[in-house]
Amino acid sequence: MTLFSCSVQMPLEERSLTNLPLNLLFRILSHLDMNDLQNIGKTCTLLRMLANENIVYRNAVIGSNGNMWWTKNVLVDVFDVLNFNRKAMKTLNSHNISLVASLRNVQRKYKLGVIDPARKTISYRTNEVESKEKGSVKDLNMDLNEPTEITREQIAHTAILQGMNQFIELNDKAFRTHSADSDDTYIEENNGEIHSLHGLEKNTTFEEDLVKKPPFIPSPTFSNYSRSSTNSVFSSSSPKLLDDDWNNITMDFTKSRDPDYKEMTPTSTESSDSITRLRKSNKVKDKAELFEKLIFRDSRPLKTKKKDNPRLKLSSSLSANDEDFRKIISPPSDILPKVGRRSVSRGYLEEIERHYPDFNGETTNPLAIKRVNSTKIANYEQLIIKENSSNCKGITEKNDENKFQRSHTSPVIELSKPHQRSKLKAVVTDGNKICYRKIELDNPSGSNTNDHVIKRLDANTDFNI
């Protein structure tokens, strides 16, 4: 009997992209195009949050002129810390807080990881010149100063990681407190300093922490830094969200498609009195409800009814009997802008009095103005009918030719029927006399010319003249 007589097929494990660590997922998404990020962001909530962070990283960090290595290193480590508890990512996302934007603000405020290139070049050249005369004294001074800067950045890096770890612990306790339906007092553990959410230590600035605290070894479980800051999610003060491009660039990823994660949003009918009452309360439930109401109020879109476009679409061919044509010439009152007082020019009044003597100056009467507009519409209709008729086209072409011929002889252009002017023809008689005869255009050419002679003038001159 062979060893491989029976082969048992083991079921394949489910493999998903979300099973990878967060820092590795962030690096993978950083190599994708914008269209691919949008498609991945529509799959689940976790990938949508990472795609949003990647967009902020491209816009704020990569597009900036400062050094970005410090922000990038801290960001990768923060994602590594959040990988153990991904519920904290959803908490940050529910409050529209961006990790990349927050780290970038800290880096800009305290100028972490920024080295002035001009200053570095000048100091290097000075050391190169003076080292030949005075040895390497300047070089030693530079070497003594460099560890100070590196230590300061390392302390900031470690403090941020421990603050994130502290936030994860508070987030877990908040979830457990809400699920157990207990009051705001937490279960006491090894850290006897923290008894409740509002029993945290007093707020201190980052520079004071760097001065007061000696160098310490980072601890993965507990941290004294950043317990309660003004920007913290569970702070007793009013929430302060990031005024960054975070709310603008997440327009494509606002809709979550993860069925397991449901965002709790309060109703829009809550009054401002309840918000004031929740601000004065010290309970964890009231604080969480207050944050949800404030975020819902800030991020709630305005519900406005879509109004129909008042602009009318022009059809390919308009006629006098078409309803669209009437709307263009005389639009209805609901489309026209509402004006409290209408100013009418003096020239317009004189023109109305000249065309309509019985108008009696009733310019403020809307019925009179409407009557004038209806008369104009009738004139436009007749003009369009006349221009579109086939007989009128031939008449207008003939009139144009006649006007062109008369323009060389007479500067006056008459609007009425052109006058057929009589022409005289010079005729030489047998006695070498010149006489003028009138030529009628309407008569046939074969008729007797002697019957149409009106006037005969004797020149009494020779033919040679």
Curated annotation (Swiss-Prot):
Domain F-box positions: 14-60
Note: Present with 1360 molecules/cell in log phase SD medium.
Cellular component annotations (GO), alphabetically ordered: mitochondrion; SCF ubiquitin ligase complex
UniProt record, GO biological process: intracellular distribution of mitochondria; mitochondrion organization; SCF-dependent proteasomal ubiquitin-dependent protein catabolic process
A Pfam family reported for this protein in Swiss-Prot or TrEMBL: F-box-like
PANTHER family xref list: DACTYLIN, F-BOX_WD REPEAT-CONTAINING PROTEIN 4
Bias (Basic and acidic residues): 254-263
InterPro entries recorded: F-box-like_dom_sf, F-box_dom, SCF_F-box/WD-repeat
CDD domains tied to this protein: F-box_ScMFB1-like
Region Disordered, annotated ranges: 253-279
Ranges of compositional bias, category Polar residues: 265-275
Protein name: Mitochondrial F-box protein MFB1
Annotated keywords: Mitochondrion
Compartment annotation: Mitochondrion
